[in-house]
UniProtKB/Swiss-Prot annotation:
Positions in coiled-coil regions: none
Gene3D superfamilies: 3.30.1370.30, 3.30.1490.10
Keyword Ribonucleoprotein tagged: yes
An annotated GO BP: translation
Family: Belongs to the universal ribosomal protein uS8 family.
SUPFAM superfamilies cross-referenced by the UniProt entry: Ribosomal protein S8 (SSF56047)
Organism: Lawsonia intracellularis (strain PHE/MN1-00)
PANTHER family: 40S RIBOSOMAL PROTEIN S15A
Lineage summary: Bacteria, Pseudomonadati, Thermodesulfobacteriota, Desulfovibrionia, Desulfovibrionales
Identification of the protein by name: Small ribosomal subunit protein uS8
Listed NCBIfam families: PRK00136.1 (NF001109)
Gene Ontology molecular function terms on file: rRNA binding; structural constituent of ribosome
Oligomeric and partner information: Part of the 30S ribosomal subunit. Contacts proteins S5 and S12.
Length: 126
């Protein structure tokens, strides 16, 4: 039984990129699809497809290195982390992004700062 589907998604992405796979399949849920869309908008993945209840992410590589260097789950099922607009962290001195679940949906940290909303800090990507 899976207790944290977002952690499972991040682990699948991390493991697939370490094995230099060109894509990874993840079971569909609305929040995972939203996170995948943010990764595509921010340029961390090439393409994103949805078919038969599965999200397929196609990775970006530059000279054999993955575009995503690291992923980290922040808010976990045992310890939720909430931030206000002013407390949204800078990831890797601005070279990464954080993803938040807010009242306006799942968004990246830059959009959250512009929209002046806080929320649950889901994960960091760099």
């Amino acid at each position: 039984m899976m207790t944290d589907p977002i952690s499972d998604m991040l682990t699948r992405i991390r493991n697939a990129q370490l094995a230099l796979h060109k894509d990874v399949a993840i079971p569909y849920s609305k929040i995972k699809y939203s996170i995948a869309n943010i990764l595509k908008e921010e340029g961390y993945i090439n393409e994103l497809t949805l078919n038969n209840g599965t999200i397929t992410l196609y990775f970006k590589y530059y000279k054999g290195k993955a575009a995503i260097e690291g992923l980290r789950r922040i808010s976990k099922s045992g310890r939720r982390v909430y931030v206000s607009t002013h407390d949204i962290p800078s990831v890797q001195n601005g070279l990464g992004i954080c993803i938040l679940s807010t009242s306006i949906g799942v968004i990246g940290c830059n959009k959250a700062r512009c929209s002046k909303v806080g929320g649950e800090l889901l994960c960091e990507v760099w």
